[in-house]
């Protein structure tokens, strides 16, 4: 990252021509301290993303890495986060478990709990966006409901997986990474609630599950995707 204010300030320092070693040492120490503080401020600019876990296939475990039999909602949020160490490079991550269910068991009670909590959570200055891990069976219904009831311009992203966490080629880790990228992107502000699956960013009003097997399970057939995530960037 290039900070032209920093470059300008250092160029001014370099114009000084001290005639004694004490002054030269002071300028050197001051410049070093300034650069250290600037580096710290850059590190703090990572977005603060809070992850709410509800269970689903993304947190599922199976008896076989190649089989299709599994139990949803078995992996806790801290394990999901730990499984994707790259998350710490793109955001300051916090997380909490809301429920541990398959999304076929999603209820009005959980929906209302999520809506009330999100409206409170998104008012906090230290929260820049929220990711919700969710089963895919009722993900579109949850997204649509939250899009109507959450009153904030901050990004809210639902994410899931078509393969359990113990699968040989689990899609959950990359989906979670892409969801955090999306929740922390300036392009996502004011877009409403979104679903991120298999690199596609879909609006809650248009997303629907079109396939029960393929990792490209969600589409927005009437409006198309809002965008996509590629190489850790929102496009």
Q: Which positions does each model-derived feature cover?
A:
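Intrinsically disordered, low-complexity segments enriched in small/polar residues
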Residues: 1-3, 38, 65, 71
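Short intrinsically disordered, low-complexity coil segments enriched in acidic
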Residues: 1-5, 35, 232
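Short hydrophobic targeting helices and cationic amphipathic motifs
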Residues: 4, 9-13
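Bacterial N-terminal signal peptides that target proteins for export
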Residues: 14, 19-28
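Bacterial N-terminal signal peptides
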Residues: 28-38
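Boundary at the C-terminal end of the N-terminal hydrophobic targeting segment
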Residues: 39-43
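Active-site histidine-anchored catalytic micro-motif
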Residues: 44-235
């Amino acid at each position: 990252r290039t900070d032209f204010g920093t470059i300008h300030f250092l160029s001014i320092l370099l114009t000084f021509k001290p005639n004694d070693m004490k002054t030269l040492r002071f300028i050197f120490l001051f410049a070093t301290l300034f650069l250290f503080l600037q580096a710290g401020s850059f590190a703090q600019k990572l977005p603060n993303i809070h992850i709410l876990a509800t269970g689903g296939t993304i947190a599922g475990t199976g008896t076989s890495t190649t089989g299709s039999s599994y139990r949803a909602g078995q992996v806790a949020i801290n394990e999901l986060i730990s499984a994707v160490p790259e998350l710490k490079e793109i955001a300051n991550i916090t997380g909490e478990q809301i429920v541990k269910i398959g999304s076929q068991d999603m209820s009005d009670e959980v929906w209302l709990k999520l809506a009330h909590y999100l409206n409170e959570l998104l008012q906090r200055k230290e929260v820049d966006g929220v990711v919700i891990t969710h089963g895919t069976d009722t993900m579109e219904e949850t997204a649509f409901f939250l899009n109507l009831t959450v009153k904030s311009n901050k990004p809210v992203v639902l994410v899931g997986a078509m393969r359990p966490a113990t699968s040989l080629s689990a899609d959950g880790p990359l989906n979670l990474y892409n969801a955090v990228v999306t929740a922390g992107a300036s392009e996502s502000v004011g877009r409403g609630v979104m679903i991120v699956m298999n690199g596609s960013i879909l609006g809650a009003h248009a997303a629907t599950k079109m396939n029960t097997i393929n990792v490209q399970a969600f589409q927005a057939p009437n409006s198309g995707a809002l965008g996509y995530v590629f190489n850790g960037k929102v496009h």
